[in-house]
Amino acid sequence: TDSELYAQISRDLGADVPFLRSAENSSDSASSWAVVREVIERYGNEGKVFDTCVLLQPTSPLRTSEDIRNSFALYCEKNAKSVTSVCEVEHPVQWCFELGEDRLMDSFVNSPYKKCRRQLLPKNYQLNGAIYITSCENMLSEDFDFYGEKCYAYVMPHDRSLDIDDDVDLAIAELLMKKRAQ
């Protein structure tokens, strides 16, 4: 956070808040990677150096400790440059198309996949935002590219891959968390 008020609330609730985010990395346009890089650099300036960076975004609360351990094991086993979590796409990408302003579905109607059963199409995967792992050295490099060479996918099931972007996602997450707690 860049807010002293939120930092104090966090401290009051037991969180460690070693420093506030810079103004540069506090805007809506700041990337998560820029913020993580800032944290690594600031700790480095204090003489605290880390080998590995694991980003667990709070908007993906359904991942489990097992997912974190298994993705880290994959990172180590493959000697990966990075690992990111993914899940199978719910609907085949072959059924996706762009709509023009006229809303005509020509691109779908003319698609060779329109009558193809989903089960016969190749599986596709999407980033789910739950887990990102890379070396701190990679994070600090001038040519940082998380998805470059030797980036491996850790596949997670759909029920743990919810990324909360709106009120509907939040309601679904709450429902799934209640179900998990039973």
Predicted features along the sequence, with ranges:
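A short acidic, often aromatic-flanked loop/helix-cap motif at beta-alpha or helix-coil junctions
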Residues: 24-28, 91-92, 159-162
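Residues that scaffold the ATP/ADP-binding catalytic core of kinase and kinase-like folds
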Residues: 9, 18, 108, 141-142, ...
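Short, glycine- and charge-enriched coil/turn segments that flank and shape catalytic ligand pockets
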Residues: 44-49, 78-79, 101-103, 182
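Hydrophobic helical membrane-anchoring modules
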Residues: 153-155, 159-182
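Short phosphate-binding loop-to-helix
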Residues: 5-54, 62-66, 70
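Conserved core of the sugar-phosphate nucleotidyltransferase
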Residues: 29-34, 38, 61-150, 154
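Short beta-strand/loop segment that forms part of the nucleotide-sugar
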Residues: 1-3
